Every structure is written in C-alpha cells, then in structure tokens.
C-alpha cells in the first residue's frame, strides 16, 4: 500500500504542474520509447532474416534489450501512467505522402532514422525528468549510427553484386595490348566483373 501511496503523490505532483509541460515530457518519453523499440525490432529482423548477418543482428538485439532494461526502470514508469492516446493530437494526423519503400534498403534506412531520432528525443527529454538515463540513451544513439553504417555498406555491396552472374579472372602477366583487347572483348560480351590476378 505504501508503494501505491507514493505513486499517487508522484502523480499528484506531476499533474499539479500549471502548464502541463512535465506531463508532456513524460508523454514524449512514452511515445519515443515505443517508437524506438519498434524501429530497432525492424532493424533486427532485417539484419537477421534478410541479410543473414549474425553479428549485426546480435548488436541490434543487444540495443533493443538495453532499451527495454532502461524502459523498465521504476523512475521511468510515470510515462506509462500518463499515456493518453485518446487525447493525443498526433494520432489522427497523417503525412501527405510517405516516400515509396520499394526495396529493403529503404525500409532499413527509414527505421534506422526513426530509431536514432526517437532515441535523440529520449535523450533530450530524459535530461528534464530522469537525467540518470540520459548518457545511456546517447550511447545507444551512437550505436544505432554505427549499426546503420555497417548494414547499409552490406546492403549496397549486395545490390551491386546482384546483377553479376559471371566473374572472369584474368592473369595480368601478359602483353599489355593483348590484355586490353581481351578486356574489351569481355566487356563487349556483357561481362560485368573482371578480377585481376598476378
């Protein structure tokens, strides 16, 4: 019962703010927590099931679990108690047009941006009500940036190699004129990748 009493006094203190700015901060933390967890889950799924990258999918999973540990902290539970979806003015607003996501890289990039932006919001708002977690959010945001860079490098490389059905290995130890003629013939025949060997 003492816990319930403490919870009620915390809520009264939060709700007694004249302009509701503290309530707004908690609601921002709640929305950003949900957004970041959802986005990181999408990143993890793409890394695991589309790229089959064990290392990067483990990193995404670790980030997601670290976020969950932070969100479970007792000093962050006011965000859930102050959740008010029915009066959220942004629930019914729609953007005019979302850019088309026709490839997996578009989905990955959009969710990496969503994750880093929402974690940045968590970082900034937590400074005002639970500064003890701010540094953790900052560190996680930088890890998202690194994860995005590594994954996009892999995705770009895979896209470049997707069209290549034949790779020709050429020995460079031959006269230069013959070598140039052979390369020209291979390119004219549609070869898209040539590897040079000594």
Residue spans of the language-model regions?
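Intrinsic disorder/low-complexity segments
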Residues: 2-4, 8, 197
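Structural preference for solvent-exposed beta-strand-turn elements
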Residues: 6, 10-34, 38-158
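Conserved N-terminal beta1-alpha1 strand-loop-helix module at the mouth
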Residues: 146-198
